């Protein structure tokens, strides 16, 4: 199907990519009982709120710089094995602080994993620092300040994730101003759990180059046209959207409608093992569930490289590999 195609992923949360087998090994290492959040190699949750709790439980078994290097390298090697040439990982230095590891050690572990994976397979990767909306504006601003001041060359963008129903986008706008002034690429989660208004607010108040998900924009034809006119890129994660019941099934998912309306769309996996998916599956779904041709899928991959937060020399090299 799509195994012969090069792949790019712009939207994946690092801890959300933790393979259950690795999480189980980590839990045994730290003597953590996994029954509350994992059974038979499957992460357990029922709705978005429970998903966030499960996500945090899984994250708790990754505790050291070495743990994060291992997690990062493991996921990137998985991607490289299916023909992925570039990945952006959404990471949270604030999480490093919360678990007592520290933001710097957390980021160094992740960065070491990126370097190790690149040395083995040649895969390129960058880091998107995220603030988590449900922890409030001050924490999101702190995350932006961390990203803005960091001298880590792998940090290339800033994002806001978490519980979309908490607070107004306006409450968090300062964080994005800080990141933008530092030259970081700007993306934001919107239009996933909440409707088209969430995307409209993000466009108006944050002015992002990209939007994580953004699929609920389909509910407002004028907004869809605006996204197309602006060239705003959507990081679409169909498997995640179905798993979270954003849409009931793939025939009702608007990926093709958005693309046909001129919106620039890309394909990602979000939190793959939580949603019983993978980047490989997302590309296959583009073919089987949405009916995209190889040329159309390659065009979305090209869009992802064009929209990636990275230097122009690396972008040109990646485009040459398609």
Swiss-Prot record:
Top enzyme category: hydrolase
Cofactor: Zn(2+)
Active site: 192
Zinc among keywords: yes
InterPro entries, sorted: A_deaminase_dom (IPR001365), ADE (IPR028892), Ado/ade_deaminase (IPR006330), Metal_Hydrolase (IPR032466)
Binding site for substrate: 271
Enzyme Commission code(s) on record: 3.5.4.2
Cofactor binding: number and manner: Binds 1 zinc ion per subunit.
A GO molecular-function annotation: adenine deaminase activity
Organism superkingdom: Bacteria
Keyword annotations from UniProtKB, A to Z: Hydrolase, Metal-binding, Nucleotide metabolism, Zinc
Residue numbers marked as site, Important for catalytic activity: 213
Positions annotated to bind Zn(2+): 11, 13, 189, 270
GO biological process: adenine catabolic process; hypoxanthine salvage; nucleotide metabolic process
Record's keyword annotation contains Manganese: no
A Pfam family it matches: A_deaminase
Reaction(s) this enzyme catalyzes, per UniProt: adenine + H2O + H(+) = hypoxanthine + NH4(+)
Function noted in UniProt: Catalyzes the hydrolytic deamination of adenine to hypoxanthine. Plays an important role in the purine salvage pathway and in nitrogen catabolism.
HAMAP family given in the database record: Adenine_deaminase
Family: Belongs to the metallo-dependent hydrolases superfamily. Adenosine and AMP deaminases family. Adenine deaminase type 2 subfamily.
Protein name: Adenine deaminase
């Amino acid at each position: 199907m799509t195994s012969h195609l090069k792949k790019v992923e712009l939207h994946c949360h690092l801890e959300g990519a933790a393979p259950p087998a690795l999480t189980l090994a980590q839990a045994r290492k730290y003597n953590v009982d996994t029954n509350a959040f994992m059974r038979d190699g499957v992460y357990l949750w029922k709705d978005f709120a429970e998903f966030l709790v499960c996500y945090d439980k899984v994250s708790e078994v990754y505790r050291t710089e070495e743990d994060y290097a291992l997690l990062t390298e493991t996921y990137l090697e998985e991607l490289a094995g299916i023909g992925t040439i570039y990945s952006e990982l959404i990471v949270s230095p604030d999480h490093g602080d919360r678990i007592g590891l520290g933001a710097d050690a957390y980021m160094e572990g992740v960065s070491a994993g990126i370097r190790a994976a690149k040395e083995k397979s040649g895969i390129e990767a960058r880091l998107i620092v995220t603030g988590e909306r449900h922890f409030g504006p001050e924490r999101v601003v702190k995350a932006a300040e961390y990203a803005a001041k960091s001298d880590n060359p792998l940090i290339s963008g800033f994002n806001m994730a978490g519980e979309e129903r908490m607070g107004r986008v306006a409450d968090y706008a300062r964080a994005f101003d800080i990141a933008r002034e530092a030259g970081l690429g700007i993306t934001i989660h919107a239009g996933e759990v909440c409707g088209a208004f969430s995307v409209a607010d993000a466009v108006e108040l944050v002015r992002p180059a990209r939007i994580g998900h953004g699929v609920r924009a389909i509910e407002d034809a004028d907004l869809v046209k605006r996204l197309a006119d602006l060239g705003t890129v959507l990081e679409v994660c169909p498997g995640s959207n179905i798993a979270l019941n954003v849409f009931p099934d793939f025939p009702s998912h608007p990926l093709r409608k958005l693309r046909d309306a001129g919106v620039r769309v890309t394909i990602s996996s979000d939190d793959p093992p939580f949603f019983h998916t993978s980047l490989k599956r997302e590309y296959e779904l583009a073919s089987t569930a949405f009916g995209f041709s190889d040329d159309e899928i390659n065009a979305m991959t090209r869009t992802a490289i064009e929209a990636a937060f990275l230097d122009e020399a690396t972008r040109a090299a990646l485009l040459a590999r398609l």
